Amino acid sequence: MKQLALVTGGAASGKSAYAERRIQEMFSAAKLPEKRLIYLATMFNDGGPEAAARIRRHRALRAEKGFETIEKPCDLEALLSDNRIWKSQEGAAGEYPAAPKGVSADLQGGFILLEDLGNLLANERYLSEGRLSGVCADPPMRVEEPNLSAPGGNEDRQYYPEDALLREYILAPLLTMAEAASALVIVSNEIFSDGETYPPETMRYIRALGLLHRWIAEEADEVTEVVCGLPLMKKGRIGEG
């Protein structure tokens, strides 16, 4: 694996701006101008005004920074091999001027900013083409896991059918991408601290995102939470002992 970083934060925390600076720092430090600086956008564009406004805002943030954009709301595995992915060069006004181009060679050794993990998970769960959509309504199962501190040496835990699929369809492609790229920075949302209890389906989504955060953090060189624009290092710093 090359360089893998996870950046989390609440809404309007400054996580996107920090993640952009971080991937640009990695790109500059590597001194590999022949490699690509890639923005991997996972938001599903439904053509509505809210989606258009968010796209315009993020395009403005990245204006003239040299990013190439790949739009892929779900099915990251296809991104690693499929030649029907749409890619665009940042900077043009209006909608993305997209053209079909295989991206496998582009990803190899590239510096990739993925924004964001929460959208990717939601799309895999709720879009008709999402590969988790068929199992997310299945009831949880109870399993016993070894736990020496629990009575009898075992602990009852809930297991959801999509847990293994989260690893297969989201985590594994992300780790493959990180291995192929020079650097991968993943942006995600901090949605775990408000103390509220939501409907079961929402809580199930929150749980799934938490699992992904935990698994990615275990593999990452660097984990940062951004609060009020300030990066709080949770794990490591790439390039530092």
Residue ranges of predicted features:
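Conserved P-loop
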Residues: 2-102
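Short, well-ordered coil/turn elements that cap or connect secondary structure elements
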Residues: 32-34, 62-64, 107, 179-181, ...
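Residue-level signal for inorganic ion chemistry
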Residues: 19, 58, 113, 189, ...
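Short, glycine/serine-rich, charged loops/turns that create anion-binding
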Residues: 11-12, 44-46, 118, 191-192, ...
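Residue-level preference for the first positions of well-ordered beta-strands
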Residues: 4-6, 36, 109-111, 183-185
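Helix-adjacent hinge/juxtasegments
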Residues: 65-165
